[in-house]
């Protein structure tokens, strides 16, 4: 046993053991109707994953945990605790759909009132809590990148409790639900297929990049219709003009992994690159291209690995990406909604993929709303893109801020503007003046023939309209099942045009009339409901705890490997202490007159594998990046604490 592991175990033993609170909620999913208690889990290593299905970081962690589920089999039980951010996420049917959509193959506790969230003092999505086989909490960690450390910890716990005789093997509580079959399954995005004849050979499930195998449907000539990302089937589908008749399928689980955004390249770019259709291959963290003439699929950007840093650029095939969600063509480049890093990137296409380059176009990777110069702007999971008809800007559906935003060219460079939306924790269905109107987690956007904008207001189940000339927001349609995209289907004249909506949770494309008269809905303004933490006014110490996993240590050879960024909404809450600098502690000065606020904290820490005997970090050691963003509601009280402690990784 490495000395690091022994030290890690000794550290846990030295700390007073805390019995895990019971798992309490509205009910369970993926258990065949059975309830789960901590007593029934005794003898297993348990990992609780506090998540919410809107959260891109939570989806990343789901993917990080899959290999652990497979590796440890009947020794580990993974429990998802779904504690919702948005009102829509508290809906039981919506949660069931999300569990299927994201292939969650473990039990999930439905925690709509945040009962278990509060019992475990969770403060961020995602949060992981590890329980030993005797039912005690042994570790808590927030954010992404913990898979390696979890594996080391689980190995340690298995060895320890095998020796003690307290480890129990055997089947876990997971029961797979029925798997329904539909033509489309949780479709993501739609675009219009080219009306000109293009010979295309449908392709089936492929296992190698740059492949072209047939699904057996034979050759056909495209005559319009639509391309749809059939996300849960991991394919791109060509549908006829009726939106229902299948003409061809491209890809499959061996090629795509939850494809989202689609982009038909302009004629010049098609001729230059030999590719026709680009695909945002979200979980593979790549941009892929389809050649319609023979079904060839190849990677044009990304390495297949998730980007852990929050910047990058250079040769596209050597640059990792992070959950690209949508694509648009603007100023002779491909704009990428990089949802995983809360940024917009640009892809420049050369004559071959080896000549392609990528660069960050807008966003610092901090989550939130900040307008102005693109390099200083903040986004939060941008998920929908549409280029304006005059080419002056790109419309952006910024999902986690429930906002409609745009990127345009200014005298100084690129500029970001918010048209509708208030911030990370404000949402609702409110029409009227744009500065007071509210959306709820929009995923799609398109420009209408009159220059106004249609937004797929996903969690409100609606299509909303923003009119830039009047500054008004109205509602075009309601009662839709998580609309994730919307496009305009033109008629012979503008008056004959209609909308085509991707109803993701209904697994279909739905035509919607484009009427001159729109509804005006005076719904409720809502905020994410989490109990605020009390805090004192004046000087307060912010402390982020980070204990590297056994076998790793912070590497100080080139300076402090940590970074802490702090801000607040409203900004006046912090009289001092805002900003970005190294270190995991910060003295904040809080203005008593403000009363309450959301404290935004972003942290990064890099730990490297150390020598098992000396603990020293070798010159070419493998390093691991740990990062998390918190949005913590705070309220000032007279006897509030003067220390705020957040766990990035506590053991």
Predicted regions: what they are:
Residues 2-38:
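N-terminal "domain-start" segment that seeds a small globular fold
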Residues 59-101, 112-116:
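Structural microenvironment flanking redox-active thiols in thiol-disulfide oxidoreductases
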Residues 96-131:
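Short, internal strand/loop/helix patches
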Residues 132-212, 216-221, 518:
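Thiol-/selenol-based redox modules, centered on thioredoxin-like
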Residues 169-188, 196-204, 209-210, 220, ...:
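Gly/Pro-rich loop segments of beta-rich domains
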């Amino acid at each position: 046993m490495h000395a690091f592991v022994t030290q890690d175990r000794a550290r846990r033993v030295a700390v007073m053991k805390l019995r895990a609170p019971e798992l309490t909620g509205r009910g369970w999913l993926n258990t065949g109707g059975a309830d789960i208690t901590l007593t029934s889990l005794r003898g297993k290593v348990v990992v609780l994953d506090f998540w919410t299905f809107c959260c891109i970081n939570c989806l990343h962690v789901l993917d990080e945990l899959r290999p652990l589920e497979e590796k440890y089999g009947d020794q580990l039980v993974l429990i998802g605790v779904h504690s919702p951010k948005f009102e829509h996420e508290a809906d039981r049917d919506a949660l069931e759909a999300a569990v299927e959509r994201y292939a969650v193959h473990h039990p999930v506790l439905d925690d709509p009132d945040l009962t278990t969230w509060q019992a475990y003092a969770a403060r961020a999505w995602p949060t992981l809590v590890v329980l030993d086989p005797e039912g005690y909490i042994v570790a808590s960690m927030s954010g992404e990148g913990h898979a390696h450390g979890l594996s080391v910890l689980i190995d340690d716990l298995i060895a320890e409790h095998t020796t003690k005789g307290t480890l129990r093997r055997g089947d876990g509580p997971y029961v797979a639900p029925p798997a329904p079959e539909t033509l489309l399954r949780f479709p993501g995005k739609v675009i219009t297929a080219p009306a000109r004849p293009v010979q295309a050979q449908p392709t089936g499930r492929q296992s190698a990049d740059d492949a072209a195998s047939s699904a057996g449907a034979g050759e056909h000539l495209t005559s319009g219709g639509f391309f749809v990302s059939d996300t849960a089937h991991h394919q791109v589908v060509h549908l006829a003009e009726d939106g229902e008749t299948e003409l061809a399928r491209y890809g499959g689980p061996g090629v795509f992994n939850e494809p989202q955004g689609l982009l038909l390249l302009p004629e010049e770019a098609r001729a230059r690159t030999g590719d026709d259709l680009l695909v945002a291959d979200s979980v593979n963290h790549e941009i892929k291209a389809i050649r319609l003439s023979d079904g060839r699929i190849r990677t044009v950007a990304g390495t297949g690995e998730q980007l852990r840093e929050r910047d990058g650029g250079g040769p596209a095939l050597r640059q990792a990406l992070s959950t690209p969600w949508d694509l648009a063509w603007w100023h002779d480049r491909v704009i990428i909604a990089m949802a995983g890093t809360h940024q917009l990137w640009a892809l420049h296409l050369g004559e071959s993929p080896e000549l392609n380059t990528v660069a960050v176009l807008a966003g610092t990777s901090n989550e939130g709303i900040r307008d102005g110069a693109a390099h200083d702007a903040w986004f939060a999971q941008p998920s929908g893109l549409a280029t304006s008809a005059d080419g002056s800007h790109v419309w952006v559906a910024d999902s986690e801020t429930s906002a409609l935003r745009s990127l345009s060219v200014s005298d100084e460079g690129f500029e970001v503007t918010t048209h509708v939306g208030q911030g990370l924790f404000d949402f609702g269905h409110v029409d009227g003046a744009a500065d007071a109107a509210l959306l709820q987690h929009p995923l799609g956007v398109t420009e209408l023939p009159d220059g106004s904008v249609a937004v797929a207001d996903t969690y409100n189940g609606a299509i909303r309209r923003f009119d830039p000339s009047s500054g008004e927001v109205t509602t075009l349609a309601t009662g839709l099942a998580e609309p994730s995209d919307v496009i305009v289907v033109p008629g012979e004249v503008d008056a004959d045009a209609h909308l085509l909506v991707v109803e993701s949770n209904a697994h279909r494309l739905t035509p919607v009339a484009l009427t001159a008269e729109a509804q005006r809905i005076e719904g409720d303004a809502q905020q994410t409901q989490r109990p605020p933490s009390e805090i004192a006014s004046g000087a307060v110490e912010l402390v982020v705890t980070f204990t590297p996993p056994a076998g790793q240590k912070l590497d100080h050879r080139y300076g402090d490997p940590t970074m802490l960024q702090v801000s607040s909404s409203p900004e006046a809450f912090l009289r001092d202490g805002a900003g970005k600098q190294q270190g995991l502690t910060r003295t904040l000065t809080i203005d008593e007159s403000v009363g309450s606020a959301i404290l935004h904290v972003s942290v990064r820490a890099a730990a490297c594998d150390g020598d098992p005997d000396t603990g020293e970090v070798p010159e070419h050691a493998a390093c691991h990046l740990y990062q998390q963003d918190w949005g913590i509601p705070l309220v000032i009280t007279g006897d509030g604490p003067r220390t705020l402690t957040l766990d990035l990784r506590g053991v």
